Amino acid sequence: METSRQNPTTSRAKAKSTEATVRLPREALTPEDHLEILKQLYLARYFDVRLIKEKRRGRLTGTLYSSHNQEGILVGTLFGLRPDDWISPIHRDMPAFFMKDLRAGWDNPDRLGMSVEEVCAQVWCRSGSPGRARDNWSHIGSRSKHIIHSTSMLAGTIPVAAGVVLADRLNGGDAVVLTYNGEGSTAQGVFHEAINFAAVHKLPVITIVENNMWAYGTPVELECPTEDVARRADGYGIPGLIADGQDVFDVYDKVMTAIEYARAGNGPSIVECKTFRAYGHGDHDDDRAAKYRPNDEVEEGRSRDPIAVCKRYLVEKGYLSKAEAEQYHAENKGAQQATDEDFPPDVVAYLKKGVDYAIKSPTPPAEEGGMWVFAE
């Protein structure tokens, strides 16, 4: 049976909210903030590009879960957080681990986010990595950095996130937590249980739904009976907002609206970010994805690169000249086509520092294989 599918990054990226906003949160951003947002988009994209190249050169093992074309969600959600706020990333949010609290300074050792060296060591399964070389991807966390441990059971960390901010409230705090989920995970029973609990107790849990239209190989119309996943919020009596995931500033506006609502004691929100997955579920699925996704859907999704959308907006606002916008060309290029010259030199140097650290770090000795299995 064939169904008519619309790309959410264009025809369905409508702004919907139960809360009217007179002044957009982005209006409080400085010109420097706008340029920093673009730079962070480049950083998230370069992380993806560099790792895919390393994997295809045989210098990296394990599975990669690309965030290519979804960087607007990462940057737009993280940029407005306070250092003491919490995040709960998933497998497609690997840059979030080192991009949390990046506004405090990329090389600031005191910022509440992991270092790029730590995250790269995790990817290369090196000694001293957050996962102690037991895993090469996102199954890591840090209480001191306010990052909730990621798991393969999608939506499974939402109850944990609710518990974290409940404890914070009981201790007199007003931190919020962002939980990241794919649209497929909203059909999980634990998603309902956690959101219902957060709504009843008015907990500051902001659920970011990265709707890239596919839960592995299952299309969104077989996952959710409504056109907009955010409508699930209606059943809990909480706001359901919809953002254009390709527009980092629209994501920022919607998430900041939800953050302000939560921090004021009003409770949780769901923010659906309509986006497009550039590749397969993981790099093991790239070839298969080329067969199960319609070509026109792929072409339309790739036509709205979040870096290009951001650059156009910055030029329109006068924060970026046309010459500056044309200086780098990472947008609309696949990982194999993009080169270091397509990115700002400081972005390349920053990630190279992490990659070099990981490659030079030792692998753990065999005798550590039985350690950290049980609490001692």
Q: Would you name each region that the model predicts?
A:
Residues M1-I73, F79, H281, D285-E376:
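Conserved acidic/glycine
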Residues A15-T18, L38, S127-P130, N196, ...:
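Short acidic/polar alpha-helix capping motifs at helix-coil junctions
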Residues Y46, R92, G245:
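Residues that form or immediately flank small-molecule/cofactor binding pockets and catalytic motifs
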Residues V49-I52, R57-H201, P219-P225, A230-G237:
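Cofactor-binding active-site loop characterized by glycine-rich and histidine/acidic residues
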Residues H91, C273-T275, V373:
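A general secondary-structure junction signal
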Residues F97-M99, G217, H281, E368:
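Short acidic, gly/pro-rich beta-turn/loop elements at beta-sheet edges
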Residues I147-D356, K360:
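Glycine-rich ThDP/TPP pyrophosphate-binding loop and its adjacent helix/strand module
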